[in-house]
């Protein structure tokens, strides 16, 4: 590959709306160009990186026994009506009509098409299990596309759908795909975590996300120092609290005239924030509920919604609070409410003694509160809080928080989609059985941006070697003025390629400083300079992308350094 024959257009300027490092660097390196909001053209350079990722994904999917197919990106409304997702998916589903006024959608995912294909093709349990995958563009009509290809409307995705007769076999393939994903992200050279996750709108029983670790990540993750346990903060749980200690204080009323937050009350009383309890008033269709979490903790909305009877909860308004507690926000508590109410206590609160709560009287709090003496034991005890850094993990380690970018997700869907589309097979007894289904997605274009977020410096991208557009670029000084140097550089390029090294020759004739800056911006792992001085000495100037300085190597030393 000669860069004089390759479209490479780098820039120093970055559009003001490029917020993320990956967006800025991809634009500066000329990897992508914006066509419209959330729509990007991938340049030859960007496409080389994209294809490197795609190739590794395809190899590992094939290795895992999945079979490649290609579903239409445009799918009929009838399929999506059958699963209820035509309306449920909301505004992100791009809906279109053809000339006959028939309705279709540009699909963001392909569970319906996969289940319909399975219904048409699979008749007997003897054909199972089967796992079909595709690498295909998808479209989500994001309200606010941003961050370049990180949250574009059109994106490249690998999505796979497996079909099974039993839950046990579905679980087996789920583990198989999870192992394949670990191999994929390991081969890509990325630091990542597989985390427990909520299934969200796609549904299903078991779910794991794969996150590339990056400070700019939108998701907060918790992982244990004691094992490979990791989870999205939405679903992460700490270890059970220690048993409740015995009561040691008497109940007292204290004036807190202007102290409405746990932080202010703790400061006034000279107590640790962990001794206070936060009371959150909510309403459900069944009535008023008071949710209790420790003062230094926050309610986890997802966990709370999964508590029995809480699926439809909302925050109570001031009128409802006065009716049930006879007070106002800032002074609420579970002791002697104005009316009988349901109380949900977080596990940590249920294990507390001598704690502080609002007194249900303006300007007053209670100290030395104890379960069973000053108020009944909580009706419901559940894990309803977000974990915090330093929490004790169930495996004995400590939980640490980090941030990540979701790049993959695996689900056990069960029979949800197959049942809706009547995808059945004849079982061993000749009876119709609804197939079980698994779903496994990887955001291929998103991986490219996530890798840059994790791997960059002030000069540009620092690609993991498997993702780099080239492993090495040979830079030739003054190729048009020195035919001998140009010929030597061309010979070196051919030798590198013959040795199986992915190499390119920068023969564009740029000044050395501009050429080297481009190579750093592009993140090429290795740079070799061919010059008149080096040829006279029988050496090449070599520098790794992450090295502080260059060194002179003979050809044998160069090939040794490049791993051949």
Swiss-Prot record:
One cellular component (GO) term of this entry: cytosol
Keyword terms: Aminoacyl-tRNA synthetase, ATP-binding, Cytoplasm, Ligase, Nucleotide-binding, Protein biosynthesis
EC nos: 6.1.1.15
GO BP of this protein: prolyl-tRNA aminoacylation
Tree of life domain: Bacteria
A family per Pfam: tRNA-synt_2b
Catalytic reaction equation(s): tRNA(Pro) + L-proline + ATP = L-prolyl-tRNA(Pro) + AMP + diphosphate
Stored Gene3D superfamilies: Anticodon-binding domain (3.40.50.800), Bira Bifunctional Protein, Domain 2 (3.30.930.10), YbaK/aminoacyl-tRNA synthetase-associated domain (3.90.960.10)
Cited PROSITE patterns: AA_TRNA_LIGASE_II
GO molecular function: aminoacyl-tRNA deacylase activity; ATP binding; proline-tRNA ligase activity
Localization terms from the record: Cytoplasm
Primary enzyme class: ligase
Entry keyword annotation includes ATP-binding: yes
HAMAP family reported in the protein's UniProt record: Pro_tRNA_synth_type1 (MF_01569)
Function: Catalyzes the attachment of proline to tRNA(Pro) in a two-step reaction: proline is first activated by ATP to form Pro-AMP and then transferred to the acceptor end of tRNA(Pro). As ProRS can inadvertently accommodate and process non-cognate amino acids such as alanine and cysteine, to avoid such errors it has two additional distinct editing activities against alanine. One activity is designated as 'pretransfer' editing and involves the tRNA(Pro)-independent hydrolysis of activated Ala-AMP.
Domain remark text: Consists of three domains: the N-terminal catalytic domain, the editing domain and the C-terminal anticodon-binding domain.
NCBIfam families given in the database record: PRK09194.1, proS_fam_II
Family in the record: Belongs to the class-II aminoacyl-tRNA synthetase family. ProS type 1 subfamily.
Subunit comment: Homodimer.
Record protein name field: Proline--tRNA ligase
